[in-house]
Amino acid sequence: MNTPPAPAAPIRYFEDYPEGAVFELGSIEVDPAEVQSFAERFDPQPFHVDPQAAALSPYGGIIASGWHTASLMMRLLALGFLSPASSLGSPGIDELRWLAPVRPGDRLSGRVTVLSANPSRSKPDRGIVITLIEMRNQAGDTVLSLKPVNLLRRRPPA
């Protein structure tokens, strides 16, 4: 990874994620060597690993694997949104979309918008938060969007 480790997200609990809240995640550079190594290992399609084949593809050059883009989003999410004190994981993701190619050298920034936040009916120590996460490139184009479901611990009694 070409970026220094960022500080962990501040301690927040379910109650700190009201519907409509927006969180900026910061940004990360798409390192060309990481694009190549990730694709060689996990997604070896020609437009990710072969410059000549990629030049002839609809993308006109090497692009990052969508899964690599999602992993960059996850780093920003873990460091800027999910509090280690309250994150209890996720039962899944809805509507994962790769909306535009991500190229080596791009700088991606992330934003989280809370769509809903509801206390769990069966487990009173937690809540369920559904968000919209969007990743944009340096031109402002949305390149990735998804709607994860997060389980977050409720604030402990004082």
State where each predicted segment sits.
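Hot-dog-fold acyl-thioester-processing enzymes
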Residues: 2-92, 157-158
